[in-house]
């Protein structure tokens, strides 16, 4: 099982898809949200919204599940953890984000990063209508939200090299280079 995390705009999703395709295993990325919603018995829009907000805490939660007063964030995280563990138990796969590196510490955990200009350039290729100036604050904001969410469940671990087996600078070697390094690493640890 391989987990992929990384900075916004680094190419982590594309790399995950490339790895899964090369290995002939399932890739779980955008489709995870629907599985988590079903597992947690919550609306899909709430799961997707959790990617856009800071995590709430038991004490300061605005949204609570009425019956047991568990915060919505915790309910969704527990469903997320259950889905990720189940998918990993079903066999080899590649799982994108959603604290999977914390949930599956024994997987091959990969972090993809790149300098800010590289990441902005990648996003502008997909969204040329966006300005470079607005993208800079957007990219940093997404990274901060992602870090806050993950650190609510694994303090101090998101983005730290000690958390991952491989940290790849996609801005230096490109996604093809990242794929080559990853496949070589996987061959070495089998």
Task: Report residues per predicted region.
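Divalent-cation
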Residues: 97
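Glycine-rich phosphate-binding P-loop
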Residues: 4-20
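Small-molecule kinase domains that catalyze NTP-dependent phosphoryl transfer to phosphate-bearing small molecules
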Residues: 55-57, 131-176
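ATP-dependent small-molecule kinase phosphotransfer cores
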Residues: 37-92
């Amino acid at each position: 099982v391989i987990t992929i995390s990384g900075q916004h705009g680094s190419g982590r999703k594309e790399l995950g898809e490339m790895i899964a395709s090369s290995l002939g295993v399932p890739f779980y990325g955008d489709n995870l949200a629907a599985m988590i919603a079903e597992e947690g018995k919550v609306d899909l829009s709430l799961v997707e919204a959790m990617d856009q907000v800071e995590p709430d805490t038991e004490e300061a939660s605005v949204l609570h599940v009425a019956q047991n007063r568990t915060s919505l964030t915790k309910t969704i995280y527990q469903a997320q953890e259950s889905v990720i563990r189940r998918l990993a138990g079903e066999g080899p796969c590649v799982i994108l984000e959603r604290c999977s590196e914390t949930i599956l510490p024994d997987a091959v955990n990969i972090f993809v990063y790149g300098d800010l200009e590289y990441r902005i350039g990648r996003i502008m290729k997909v969204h040329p209508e966006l300005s470079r100036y607005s993208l800079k604050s957007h990219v940093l904001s997404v990274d901060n939200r992602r870090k806050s969410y993950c650190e609510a469940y694994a303090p101090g671990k998101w983005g730290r090299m000690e958390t991952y087996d491989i940290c790849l600078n996609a801005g230096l070697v490109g996604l093809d280079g990242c794929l080559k390094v990853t496949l070589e690493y996987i061959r070495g640890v089998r």
